[in-house]
Amino acid sequence: FDDTRLFGNAASGDGLGIALQQAAAQRTSSMSGLLGALQFADRDDIARQAGALRGDAHASLRLADTALVGSIGNVVQQHQAASRSGGDADGLAAQAAQTASAQSATTGSRLFNQLAMHLVAPADAGSDAGDAGHNRSFWARGFGSHGRIEGGAGVAGLNHTIGGIALGADTRLADDRVTLGVSLAAADMSTRSSEGAGFSGDVRALDIGGYVDALYSRGYLSAAVRYTDLRHDTRRSIEGIEGLQAPLRAKYSNDAISARVEHAFSFTTGNGLVIQPLLPVIDYMRTSATHFNEGQHAAALIGRSGSLESIRVGAGLQLFKTFDGNNGERITPRARVVWQKELGDTQARYSNGFAAAPDLLFSASSQPVGEQVLTWNLGVTSRASKRLSVMVDYVGERRDGQTQNGIQLGLGYTF
């Protein structure tokens, strides 16, 4: 154990090697099984499994947790967008289409008026929905996604797959200009490390939240707040080192709070296309501190990690337009892109120790991810009637070191 660098990397340092060196020097009897297995192991095998010995994947899992919580929040955000654009009520796109069809032929023939954009006035054009009295809605969305946290610099990558369902109800007030709603979601995430790191984990999430939309003559203001309970079940093994291959299991829980605020200006072109510059788009998420214990095996770890905080601030653009079908249905395609800068944590860290010698601590860190975050969405809403709507969305997210792509299917009913 003279070469402590054998057990280290750039992200976590050589703390594991120093801890093992101290245990060997002190002849810690409780560590004899681990020290003996490592002493007779091949150096190349030790180098390959150093990240698994440190428990780096537990730190990477914390980044995957933020992706899980963010996926649920994205479902709520997409529902709000679909409702505003004509999903569960006569939204802005439908109003814009009505405005465009009402324009005179002479006005439409002028090049300037064809290209000029004017403000949408939801309050003036939204009387049909109010007159119909349909101001309460129930909705449901199923969602699934696959993502990856890239490996590098001695940290193994982590793949994560998410699936779940979200339910909600909302009501419209103030002549349909204000929407208040609540949401409930349940989701499962399965994770597996790459590059032979021998780690897998399952996370169950239960999420509850509330949201509000406020339309005004020049655009809208949207906000949402959510609480998420997270329950983890992880399994770790040290491959290729005799005596350390038994699976190590840990179960632990923590939670997250998240919030989103978004403002947009609304414009419409002469042909009914609604253009909405988004400024600002602010996302906040905080996952609470956590700790785990893998039992009493020779390589079992105990670990603690502080809270992880994400603060994203940025801007974007979204477009949508409503088309009338041959059978009276309304179809509203949507597109959205948002750029944000991460002002919070871009790396997760644990302070770990072996269960046999918990006072000998070392660091385990995830791979750092980028500060520039790009998200996008392509979706369509089909309204078969004034009461029933169906939504389909493709969503994606990209930053240095992390990607995610997903699909959402939704159903809304207004009464």
For each feature predicted by the language model, list its residue ranges.
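Conserved small-residue
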Residues: 140, 212, 277-278, 333, ...
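Extended hydrophobic secondary-structure segments that form protein cores and membrane-embedded regions
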Residues: 138-139, 182-185, 277-282, 333-338
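Outer membrane beta-barrel transmembrane domains
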Residues: 269, 297-415
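Outer membrane beta-barrel translocator domains of Type V secretion systems
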Residues: 37-271, 391-415
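Extracellular/periplasm-exposed beta-strand and loop segments of Gram-negative cell-envelope proteins
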Residues: 147, 156-158, 189-202, 230-257, ...
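Primarily extracellular Gram-negative trimeric autotransporter adhesin
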Residues: 1-7, 106-111, 117-127, 344-355
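Solvent-exposed flexible segments
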Residues: 263, 274-289
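Charged, amphipathic alpha-helical linkers/stalks
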Residues: 1-43
